[in-house]
UniProtKB/Swiss-Prot annotation:
Belongs to the class-II aminoacyl-tRNA synthetase family. Its EC number is 6.1.1.3. Residues 209-502 are annotated as: Catalytic. This is Threonine--tRNA ligase. The gene is thrS.
Length: 617
């Protein structure tokens, strides 16, 4: 089953591959066929599998951003040798120049065909379809339920521009209680050159994979003994997290926000009032009973900020109120979709809520956009893709308020000068929103920041303020997250930098490498001076040869290695080696400390000794 029925796609139970950026295709009529090529290639693969493995049953097989896959129920696990055999058979099918034809049949005819093939999964899929039922045939013998589209003939598929990449586990309909299937991933392109470029990008994505870097650089781990999706921050990662949080707090204070701290749990009645139990229960952890009351871990911070607002009488003179919180939330994620830091069960949301007057919407949104740009650009994210989602068919709230809110979002984006796309009807039922994606160093787009107006919670909690005329009015409530999940942003950032973090953010900024034991005392004194100046410095005391010390430091991606021999100790200096700028020469302690302090204060990527001379000079 393929095409529009992709909502049936089951979740992956095995290790999720590192995402890669799609190869950018030329804007030609030929490139528009790429999805058809991938869709058709998935059918070719399914046909090949069923020829080589007659007991294999097909389920669904859509295209993806970088290729295609198909889920199979097969008695035996597919091996690497099987993938090679399947690929070879696919080449034969392509070479036969078979037509792919669309056929409309009645439900009864589709059921008859499926039963003749003994395909129970197709019968279950058929139950959800409405007539007319469409099939796609591949040659005269193979077919599948499918809405299309496809290429007209396998001769349009390039046998040198596809590859079968991996096998992973998947649950039928994404339900862990249902059958375990095998998902074969493939990729398909128009040309062999595009396939080669895809492979190169995939290798680069694997090199940058935050899960590997997190282990290699000793930043974080996820321990099975504690549970899936729960992050352990190691000292190096924790130091980086603290730096990120400190900058976030500083930016918010300077942006006119006050900070909140709220509980991790709440009485179940709060989640009933907020609507989470009606609309979000499957993503919440179950209740726990304390003193004959039931509590649940919070999946979101919003209701807590609402209660804080409602804790006292508010006047229009107080608005806008801007509150922000680095609040830890807990959400149930299925085992198959968790992925390093990108998808976890406990994470920190950088939530903020603005309570304002209707006429303040545009100014407040612009303020949020400016703060978003400031924070993201500090981590070298400057290319954005922005979507504005408007009122859906089913929505709450007055039409006039929706119109005013949407107009405010548009006006703010125009004042900011940011290009955006409109997703008509794509907003939540409780308000329009802006979604912002960031582009990383290898061209991948990541959903990050969200600005969401909410007409729901103020109504549910009966929030109000005293207007100028003495009447009670509902405030406008704006949800806002810049990082989204701090853990996820950390993973994205790690991959963007490939672990080569800028100087100000590196957990270990300078490593001192004493060449002999005789200069160890000088190195210790130097380290103490660096630490006293707020610079994160260490000493390699292993006594290994200098070449090995340098290799170890480079492997750990230390921004600056400071070699200390007898000559440097005598001069009160060190010979500096920068990851980003190479050999910096022999620099005195005083100049190094002053330059490093300046780099930290200005959040610079590397040390700069421009317009100055080294000791040797």
């Amino acid at each position: 089953m393929t095409g529009p029925e992709q909502e049936m796609v089951s979740s992956v139970a095995a290790t999720t591959p590192a995402p890669i950026a799609p190869v950018v295709l030329p804007k030609t009529s030929e490139s528009e066929n790429l999805l058809k090529i991938r869709h058709s290639m998935s059918h070719v693969m399914a046909m090949a599998v069923q020829k080589l493995f007659p007991k294999a049953q097909v389920t669904i097989g859509p295209w993806t951003e970088a290729g295609f896959y198909y889920d199979f129920d097969n008695p035996e696990p597919f091996t690497e040798a099987d993938l090679k055999a399947i690929k070879k058979e696919m080449g034969k099918i392509i070479g036969r120049k078979l037509p792919l034809e669309r056929i409309e049949v009645s439900r009864e005819e589709a059921e008859r065909r499926i039963k003749a093939q003994n395909e129970p999964y197709k019968l279950e899929i058929l139950e959800r379809l409405v007539e007319p039922i469409t099939l796609y045939t591949l040659g005269e013998q193979w077919w599948d339920l499918c809405a299309g589209p496809h290429v007209a003939n396998t001769s349009e598929l390039n046998p040198k521009a596809f590859e079968l990449e991996s096998v992973a586990g998947a649950y039928w309909r994404g339900d862990e209680t249902k059958a375990q299937l095998q998902r074969i991933y493939g990729t398909a392109w128009e040309t062999a050159d595009q396939l080669s470029e895809h492979k190169r990008r995939k290798e680069e994505a694997l090199r940058r994979d935050h899960r590997r870097l997190g282990k290699d650089l000793d930043l974080f781990s996820i321990e099975d003994e504690a549970g899936a999706g729960l992050v352990f921050w190691h000292p190096r990662g924790a130091r980086m997290r603290l730096l990120i949080e400190d900058f976030w707090r500083q930016a918010h204070f300077e942006g006119g926000y006050e900070l909140l701290y709220t509980p991790h749990v709440a009485d179940i009645s709060l989640w009933k009032t907020s609507g989470h139990l009606d609309f979000y229960a499957e993503s919440m952890f179950g209740p726990m009973e304390v003193d004959e009351r039931q509590y649940q871990l919070k999946p979101m911070n919003c209701p807590f900020h609402v209660l804080t607002y409602a804790s006292k009488l508010r006047s229009y003179r107080e608005l806008p109120i801007r509150w922000a919180e680095l609040g830890t939330v807990y959400r149930y994620e299925r085992p198959g979709v968790m992925h390093g830091l990108m998808r976890v069960r406990g994470f920190t949301q950088d939530d903020a809520h603005v309570f304002c007057l209707p006429e303040q919407i545009s100014d407040e949104i612009l303020r949020i956009l400016n703060l978003t740009e400031r924070i993201l650009s500090t981590f070298d994210f400057s290319n954005y893709e922005i979507n504005l989602s408007t009122k859906p068919d089913k929505a709450i709230g007055d039409d006039a308020v929706w119109e005013l809110a949407t107009k405010g979002l548009i006006e703010a984006l125009k004042r900011k000068g940011w290009a955006y796309k409109i997703d008509e009807g794509g907003g939540a039922f409780y308000g329009p929103k802006i979604d912002l994606k960031i582009e990383d160093a290898i061209g991948r787009m990541w959903q990050c920041s969200t600005i969401q107006l909410d007409f729901n919670l103020p109504e549910r909690f009966e929030l109000d303020y005293i207007a100028a005329d003495g009447s009670k009015q509902r405030p406008i409530m704006i949800h806002r997250a810049i990082f989204g999940s701090l853990e996820r942003f950390f993973g994205i950032m790690t991959e963007n930098y490939a672990g080569d973090f800028p100087f100000w953010l590196a957990p270990e900024q300078i490593r001192l490498l004493p060449v002999t034991d005789e200069v160890l005392g000088y190195a210790e004194e130097f380290q103490n001076q660096l630490k006293a100046a707020g610079i994160r410095a260490s000493i390699d005391r292993s006594g290994d040869r200098l070449g090995k010390l340098i290799r170890i430091g480079e492997k750990m991606k230390i921004p600056v290695l400071a070699v200390i021999g007898a000559k440097e100790a005598e001069q009160g200096a060190a010979s500096l080696r920068s990851r980003r700028d190479g050999d910096l020469g022999v620099i005195t302690k005083e100049r190094l400390i002053a330059t490093a302090q300046s780099a930290n204060q200005d959040r610079k990527a590397s040390l700069s000794f421009d317009n100055s001379v080294s000791v040797e000079e």
